[in-house]
Structure formats: structure tokens, C-alpha cells
Amino acid sequence: MSEPQDTTSPSTAAAPITASTSQEQSQTQSPPQVSATTTSSVTATAAAATAAVASPPVNGAARPTEELSCLWQGCSEKCPTPESLYEHVCERHVGRKSTNNLNLTCQWGSCRTTTVKRDHITSHIRVHVPLKLHKCDFCGKAFKRPQDLKKHVKTHADDSVLVRSPEPGSRNPDIMFGGNPAKGYATATHYFEPALNPVPSQGYAHGAPQYYQAHHPPQPANPSYGNVYYALNHGHEAGHASYESKKRGYDALNEFFGDLKRRQFDPNSYAAVGQRLLGLQSLSLPILSGGPLPEYQPMPAPVAVGGGGYSPGGHPPAPAYHLPPMSNVRTKNDLINIDQFLQQMQDTIYENDDNVAAAGVAQPGAHYVHGGMSYRTTHSPPSQLPPSHATATTSAGPMMANPATHSPTGTPALTPPSSAQSYTSGRSPISLPSTSRVSPPHHEGGSSMYPRLPSATMPDSMTAGYPTTSSAAPPSTLGGIFDHDDRRRYTGGTLQRARPEERHLPEPMDLSHDNKDDGERTPPAKPRQAPSSPGRISASLIDPALSGSANEAETMRTAQAATEVAERSDVQWVEKVRLIEYLRNYIASRLERGEYDGDSGMTRESRTPEAGPDGHMEGVETEPVSHPAKSESPVKPEAGGDTVMYPTLRGVDEDGDSKMPN
């Protein structure tokens, strides 16, 4: 039993021992260590650890016959080990401040690094000395300086868990030099103590680590391997972002309904409708899925839960989000009014300029007003302007007698001849029933916001205050007395610019021979046919723009570009139609399910003028019935009368008691 101790004691005393010799000694000592006593085992293990730290195979230690030379300037001393060489440089060449020989400039070879402290220069010397005392616990790589090891450990930040997570039935991968514990660090001095114990595999019956399996119980902590379950925090962030995006769409939809109620834009203007719907198409609306009302249902689970399944570092499930109710669609009347506005917008989209022109409703000979007066946002010319010649306003009668389809831009598809002023009218849609004035064409204050005014969709009762000669046309289509021939001047200029191009067509033809008799024109017919050649005909009569192949390619490209533009416009039109249908289905679903404020809705319905003949006015007066007996008197005669109007109600309120006995 004393032989192993005698063998190991010289190994600790002799410093220049190679790595292979120390490892062979540790291998030969391992069998007696198992059967030896505790004291002998600890002594042998400590000796093997000291030998491994003193001369590891990656440290670059010299062989017993080699020595390390000091390359400091003017020094030729040789040291047996890296430790002794490092101590030699620090004590002899660097010195100390207490001994008054401190040197802060490195003179190793051609290095002239200068520092400000002794600790800095001693740390710098480790770069030149082949001494690597700092080892990585993950891969076993050794480094000269601790800061180098710190930088190296950061590379294991992503894959450290995977490296330290053993597979079922395998040995501990943290043994750095093979499966034999005698090589490298000894098991007694290693950071992970149970090195030879196999990893229990009952916790890994499912194979690869699964992040969303909540049925597996948490495994006990084992120091031999790291935890393979990460804390999933990305789910909460993604869910929060999804909730924010849906809330933005929800608020935008509520604002859109509010604009409809306040008539902020004209539902009969195709340009205004398209521009307003464009803001909703770019957002994720919560109603596009076709489901029920979103504010009455909780958000889905991925929105609120921070991590799915079992995650030791995950957050507890948070309560589901609830969107607030829409403030602009609380009552039943709001839903009905908004549905009517959406129907107007739907009719506007279906009956825009392109569809009306395709149906043949537009006038083929009508030219349009100069672009400076119309403020149109679309590139297509309006097809509802009158012809250039002025006619009497009474001619609008037979034209408006037909149920002409109204144009989405605010004027009917077949407007009267004097309706050009509807493009520059400064009146808002709200002021149409109350005003009887047509703004002059030079007053264009509101034309940018309201480029087109509703005309064909207005009821006939709104034009009752106008003269009979113009009662067939709505107010926005009446011709004003402030014309000053502006319309005639603009349209005449357009025709004058187009006519010279038409006159160039008959110029190449020789019209001088057409006035002569057949006898004078017949004799020179043969001489003219003889010199005529295909080249001469192509040069004089054929348009050069139609002869080249390059022009044909340009024509094809132009046609293709026009086709693409038409396809894009069709796609935009389809998107607008679908969005309007979704909105109308949403309003209809709320009306069917009764998802509105019932108290205020019933109150508003009971206060409408239509509720008088039905007897619903009694329900409004149910509260004051029990207190005064006289409060019932004005209610009964009103319920019995069929011709009760608002002026009559005010009269009843004044002297209701006097009419009660009658």
C-alpha cells in the first residue's frame, strides 16, 4: 500500500514532468485508489490534480530535456516551467515599487507595450509566457488570461444548454478529455461531482425537448446537466403586438362610423368614399373574420398568455383582453342610420363613372370642364357634364323624369344642361335642405373637401321650395345666374385645340381632281398608275408610325400597361365592395342579435313622430302617471288623434287642461 504513495511523492516534487507521464501514472494509480483507504485515495487524487494543472497537454510545456528561454531584452536565462518563467519576468524585469525597480514597459522581444500599473504589465506578460491556467468548463480549452476566458465563455451563451444537456443513457459530456476520468481534471476536483453516474432517462421519454408539453412534471435539478427548457417570453410580446394592431383597427372603425354619423364626407362621392375606405383597408379590422361582435368576446389565448405550455421561467396566464364598446354605434338608431349610409356608399361604388360609361348611360358627345374647375382626384374624365351649348332649364324635365342612376361623384349620370355649377358649389351636404342659394363658380371654398354634391339620391320633397320651372332638378344641379360664360370659354378652348388635328387628316388627299369631269380625269390615269410603286405609296399615304416593328412593340407595351392599370383598378374596386359588404354584415349581425343599448334605443323610438299613432307615447309617460292624475290627460287625446304633428303637440302642452273635457 505504501508503493503507490512512494511513487507519487517524487512526481509531485519533480516539476518538469510531461503530460503523458503524469497521465500514465494516474492510470496506473487508479486500480489501487479504488481499494485503498480514504486517506491514500485523497492523497493520490490531489497529486494527480496537481500534476494535471502544472503541465496540461495544451499548455505547451517543454519536455524534460527542453527549457524555456527568457526573451527579455538583455536576458538569456532559461526556466524549466512556464510558472517559473512567469515569476522570473515579474520579479526580475518588472520589479516592484517597494524595491524601487518598477518597470512598466514590456521589453519581450520587439514588444514595447507601456502600462500605468503593475497589474496591467503582469497581465500583459501572460501573452508572451506559454502559461494557460484558465480553462473553460464547457469545452476544456485553456487560456492565458482571465479576460480571454471570459470572452470565450460568451460564445457558449447560446449553445451552453445544448452542450450540457446529455442524451438518454450517455455519460456526462462535461468530462473534458474523453470518458476516462483520470485524464484532465480528476473527478474529485471537478465542478460537476457525479461524473460517472448515467443521466436518468425517465424524464426524457418523449425524445427531443418539447417546449409546449404541459403534461410533463418539472424534473428535479441535476448539477450534471443544465436545464433544457427556455423561458418563452416571445409569446407575450407577439400577443401584445397583435392586440395593439387590432385595437388600432377597432378605433379606426369607430372613428369611421362617427364620421358617417356626422356626415364628415359625402357618401355619394366616389372619390371621397374611396379615399375614406383606403384608410380602413390598410388596418386589421376585427370584424373581417365574419365572427360576432369583438367587444363582447374575449381575445384568443395567444394574445394574453406569455408562454405556451410548461416553461419554468414563463409568466402566469394573464386575463383575456376586452375591447371597449364602440361609442358611435351604441343605439339601434345609430345602427340603422349607419346602415343607410353604407348602402349609399355601396350604391356609389357600384355606379361609378367607369361602370356607368360601360353600361352606355353616359352621353357620348359631352365633353368635360377644364380640370382646374373640377378638383377631381380620379384620372377618368367625368361623364355626367352637359354639352357645350346652353339650353333652357325646362329641358331638364324629361331628362330627370326617368329613374336615372345617380353618379358616385355626387351628380346624376344624366344631369341637366345647367348643372356644371355643381362642381364648384361651396355648399356642404348638411346645408342642402336649408339653403336655396347657388354659390357662384368663383367661390370654391368647400370644393376641395366636397368635390361632388349629392343630387340624384336626394328626395323630391327637398326641392319643394324651388320654382316649378326647376323643380325637376335637385338644388345642386341648378344653373346659377353667375355663369359669365366661364363654362363656354373653357369648353370652346378644348374644342379649338382638338379641331386642327382633325383637319390634318384630309390634307394628304388631292382634292383638286375631284372637281373635274370624268373626261379630264380619265386620260392621265395610266401615267399616274405607272410610276406609282409600293414604296411611293408607303412613303406618301401610309403613316410612318404604323410601319416600324419597334413601334409595334411600343404599342404592345402601351396596351399591356393599360391592361395592368385596368386590372389594378378592378382589384381596388373589388376590395372596396368587399369592405362595404363586411361592414353592412357587421351592422346587420348586431341588429339581429340585439347588441345595442336597449334603454336609449327604446326611448328614442318612442319619441319619434311615427310612435304617436301607434300609442307608444303612453309608455314614455309611465313614470309621471302614478304621481299626478292630470298628467294622463294630454296623453289620451294625442293617442286617439291620427293627425297629430309637432306643432299640435306644442299647442297641447300649453293648454292641455282646457282641451281635456272636449
Curated annotation (Swiss-Prot):
Tagged with keyword Membrane: no
Start-end of Low complexity biased regions: 7-42
Protein localization: Cytoplasm; Nucleus
GO MF, one example: DNA binding
GO cellular component: cytoplasm; nucleus
Positions of C2H2-type zinc fingers: 68-93, 104-128, 134-156
Post-translational modification: Activated by C-terminal proteolytic cleavage by signaling protease (probably palB/RIM13) at neutral to alkaline ambient pH.
Keyword annotations: Activator, Cytoplasm, DNA-binding, Metal-binding, Nucleus, Repeat, Repressor, Transcription, Transcription regulation, Zinc, Zinc-finger
Main subcellular location: cytoplasm
Compositional bias (Basic and acidic residues): 498-523, 595-619
Name of the protein this chain belongs to: pH-response transcription factor pacC/RIM101
Source species: Aspergillus parasiticus
